[in-house]
Amino acid sequence: EGGPDGPAYSFRGLDDVGFYKRSGTTGDAYWDVTGCGNTVDATNVGALRLILDSLRYWVTEFHVDGFRFDLASALARNGHDIDMAGAFLTTIGQDPVLRYVKLIAEPWDASMDGYLVGSFPPPWVEWNDTYRDAVRDFWRGRTSPREMASRLAGSSDLYADDGRSPYASVNFVTAHDGFTLRDLV
């Protein structure tokens, strides 16, 4: 959106105060844990409805069978705190249409407390950056065979505590952020 005085490109034109999280004592500045200049307030009823209606539309009209949520921890925020039982995660997990599609979280945001690998509730699955880092280090001779085996077997140290299976881990080596595979090896 270009900041509070910039042009309106997205939600700002609909409900600027309601759709974006605010910071400061007067609430006149955007609060940003995404690195994009603002953070959608998924606890706002209107914003949550827009998100859910949009997702349902893609599922029912175009038969999309899953979604990946970039910086998904930002959507789990209630104020500045993270609430894994909050409005967005609870509602999407109980939705009669959306609970049956694949829900993939990039389980972090751009803040120090937003790293939530292994914390998203079912039916969510998560990008596993611990796997990513272990594979990259293994190629460089920096990861033990035991660590690599743990990652290949589903990272139970991250997902088994809450009863989730290895399927909760989405293993990847490179993605849209960062280096290409060629740059890494």
Spans of features found by a protein language model:
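Substrate-binding/active-site clefts of carbohydrate-active enzymes
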Residues: 1-64, 68-94, 114, 158
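Conserved alpha/beta catalytic core and glycan-binding cleft of carbohydrate-active enzymes
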Residues: 63, 84-185
